[in-house]
C-alpha cells in the first residue's frame, strides 16, 4: 500500500492491489526473519514465501518431526538457552559437550556415539562426510521424499536422546 500512497492514484484492479499487499507482507516477513535470532536458522532453508513440498508429500507423522526441527522446537540447547538468557556461546550440546548445540550440530556434527549410529543409519554418506553449512542447507531443501522420510526418522530418534 505504500506504493499506492506514494503515487497517489487509485488502484481499481483487485489483482494489482492483492499483489501489492502480498509483496508488502513478504517484505515484512523476510525482514522479521533476518532481524531475529530465531530467524537465523530458519533463513538458512526458507528463502521463498510458499508452501513447502514436504508438507504435501509426507505422512503426518513425518511432517511433524521435520516441522519441529525446522521451527526450532526440539529443545536443543541453542533454543532452551535462549529461554533462560544463557549467552549463545554457553549453549553447549548436552550429548557431546563439545560445542554449541544448534540444529547444524545436532544434524551433522555431534560426536555422541548414539547420534553417530543414527546418522549413519538414516542419512546418506554425502551429508555425513565432511559436513558443512552448504550440505546442511541442501539437506533441508531437498525434494526427495524418501530422504525426507529418513531425515524425519533420524530427527525423531535423535531427539529422544536429548
What are these regions (language model features)?
Residues 3-6, 11, 24, 32-162:
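Family-specific functional microsites
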